[in-house]
């Protein structure tokens, strides 16, 4: 399995202090929004670095996936990490996380996603009729059948049979509910048949990507299928605030959730964003510690600050400490530049496949801009910034034994 923590440097972290250069008040919503954006973009940056490390470590891109829901900040996710799809509790945990979409098309993951979606929609129809829904223990049977390469159409028929059995003692609206359930099954069958009809072309597209020959400009069909099957991963990545990304191991039928220390409240480490101080006195001040994977976005912020004109007269009238000189900013830039050269922070630059390399670097650039924008908008990108590199007590982490 991918040894995520062994490929990352836990020897340093960053201490960051941001002081606002405006004296007008910020609402609690604005402050919450700022902190939320800092946290979200930091987490996404860590994910992109980790995806890059995984690809460079030999993980096949079709085995990387993203789920269609953000993780919920109020859930503990205490069992998140490695999920064994050969046992019922882990299957249920995976099911509740959302629908997986692979980085490149993966037939088994597509089938699992389709079954999860179909099962969920059918149970919603049953629940709407106040009928006992299908038992989630059935998910183990269905995913085991997928792992054994059984025909998905037969699995969908089984879902329909179980759903009809749930309705056998119902009289009210039974016919209408069966019709709704049958439509869900039919839609799932149609979606799968469409995938199967395109599978040969999808496989050729994947081969072209891996052989570094991929070009949509010469193939209209490629462009259509890329939109439908290849772009979804990054679309979800950008649209979700707290995406969940993982690796599927088809041989062992296991799932590994990446950056789980950001999600599992009981497994936090030195990389977790820790807000130390939020001062509401004028000027506003935010003090936090954060992992070194944020080095490049912070570097962009410092460069922006340096390029700005000197503080205007209004800001100079505030009771502030002396702003940072160019020399002091250059020192912080030098420190962050060194961290930005670390293997994990440059992992995207060494991805072997140009198609994925370009996609990930483009995502990182978008993420860097999204990190910088709110700091600038709310007046925290100024020469009052203080960033220092700190050494952690722990320098090495090992992945959990069940990996």
Language-model features, listed with the residues they occupy:
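Acidic, Ser/Thr/Pro-rich beta/coil linker or hinge segments at domain junctions
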Residues: 373-403
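Intrinsically disordered, low-complexity segments enriched in glycine/proline and serine/threonine
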Residues: 114, 127, 310, 393, ...
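Membrane-active, amphipathic/fusogenic segments and juxtamembrane/transmembrane anchors
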Residues: 2-290
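C-terminal, beta-strand-rich globular interaction domains
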Residues: 1-4, 400-402
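Periodic self-assembly scaffolds
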Residues: 288-382
